[in-house]
Amino acid sequence: MAQASGMDPLVDIEDERPKWDNKLQYLLSCIGFAVGLGNIWRFPYLCQTHGGGAFLIPYFIALVFEGIPLFYIELAIGQRLRRGSIGVWKTISPYLGGVGLGCFSVSFLVSLYYNTVLLWVLWFFLNSFQHPLPWSTCPLDLNRTGFVQECQSSGTVSYFWYRQTLNITSDISNTGTIQWKLFLCLVACWSTVYLCVIRGIESTGKVIYFTALFPYLVLTIFLIRGLTLPGATEGLIYLFTPNMKTLQNPRVWLDAATQIFFSLSLAFGGHIAFASYNPPRNNCEKDAVIIALVNSMTSLYASIAIFSVMGFKASNDYGRCLDRNILSLINEFDLPELSISRDEYPSVLMYLNATQTARVAQLPLKTCHLEDFLDKSASGPGLAFIVFTEAVLHMPGASVWSVLFFGMLFTLGLSSMFGNMEGVITPLLDMGILPKGIPKEVMTGVICFACFLSAICFTLQSGGYWLEIFDSFAASLNLIIFAFMEVVGVIHIYGMKRFCDDIEWMTGRRPGLYWQVTWRVVSPMLLFGIFLSYIVLLIQTPPSYKAWNPQYEHFPSREEKFYPGWVQVTCVLLSFLPSLWVPGVALAQLLSQYKQRWKATHLESGLKLQESRGC
């Protein structure tokens, strides 16, 4: 147990563990790890689809009672024990070593597909240095007499994404071939990650100033530009107008809790590793609150910037819809050009409907409502590589905005990769299983190369489908289980009193009633509720995916298919294999202790037998 004052044997003795150059490096590293692509492309979507401003109510409740308390535990225990995730849990109890191994496994799996998203971002970033942008027009067909039919049917941006970037197959069972342009981008991404993490926090601490701060500069630029675009106000009103009825839907509360959980990058082990390089007397309570609030405020800030541009896109699409209808009316009734303005269109259509009903009914008029176009948002890669990319096309100086947008996404993802790799590299180094004579730079290179080789499967034509599988199943359930084990391990095995003593020793202040109640009761209950909800959703909805199939009768809508049996087995393995470390290590430890006791008993019996014979 830590003492309230005086020397502590764990941390007061000078050791060789690296340390942050300054507090800002540490804060930026944690913020960079927490603030990732999900803040840009998932939170705005959830906020819009779950009642706008009403979604902020369950979101901030989850932040206060789930996110910040769990985050505080990770920072405090990492700083106190000065080890990575595996070392921390083995120190708390040898039976909990599987929690650290599970966190390590998930960090490894997530690193594989997260860096694949970065290779896509890099590909779009490199293609942004063209004018016009390559996704602004359809390519010519083989006869060069017209445009490619698939592009005309789906649209230029979707065609560039699905065909010219992914060259995706129409079924996951058809693996396809390696796409060499993506393979080269994967090489570049892993090389960049290696150069940044080559010396651990000594190297990432230098790069983090740029990778963590540059996205805020770009978001501010987009916000200023977006607010000056026509339709921006409508986009923001639509985003934040509260619909309190949505709070009656349990899915809203589940999505809010999971968004907080994954947005803070809890249970990956990266934050534990980062905190282990802190001075022992650092105020980790203040750090936890600051980083969590910055993460949430960034989500709100990004939502305003993103949806100001999305409002512009919706307004633009709405205007073009009206223009097509106006052109149809002008051609049908031989009206002079420009005789009908957008504002006059509703009244003109109403008049013609009343006087020329049959002729109007034969026209291919579309129903144009601004709200319908605002509804056409997306989350995940669909927002970044299709919806927002199309919006940028209509902005003056599209290439510049595209470079800024994908440059921002790359730095966001890169800073998150630092935390993922710390969750992989630090535990391996702390365990001492790697040869000590080999330089850290070489060991880091070997680990990055192993990750690179494992991620090559994502550069296949079916790689996009496999990335969705990894994103959906590799982390979700496992991290919830590990977070629950973290709370139980620290509060009930390490001990609440002992943990509070440690915090008092580190910060000079004992945790108050809020912290103790959330750690002991509220956070575990929320995590258990999320776990049960996930299990119910998995049972109710068989795993399926949406395939890009030009032969599908409703193309360009994607064809929904169920995963083949062997893929469903893979989904189950990804969902539960990392978690099996927990009972596996506990059982191995139990057998080891039983074996030792058995040997000790037999040795003692043998000695007594020899003594009796000697007598």
Swiss-Prot record:
It comes from the Eukaryota. Changing D502N: Decreases protein abundance. Strong decreases of cell surface localization. Strong decreases on alanine uptake activity. Changing K90T: No effect on protein abundance. No effect on cell surface localization. No effect on alanine uptake activity. Glycans are attached at N143, N167, N353. Changing M297C: No effect on protein abundance. No effect on cell surface localization. No effect on alanine uptake activity. One of its GO terms (molecular function) is neutral L-amino acid transmembrane transporter activity. This is Sodium-dependent neutral amino acid transporter B(0)AT3. It comes from Mus musculus (Mouse). The gene is Slc6a18.
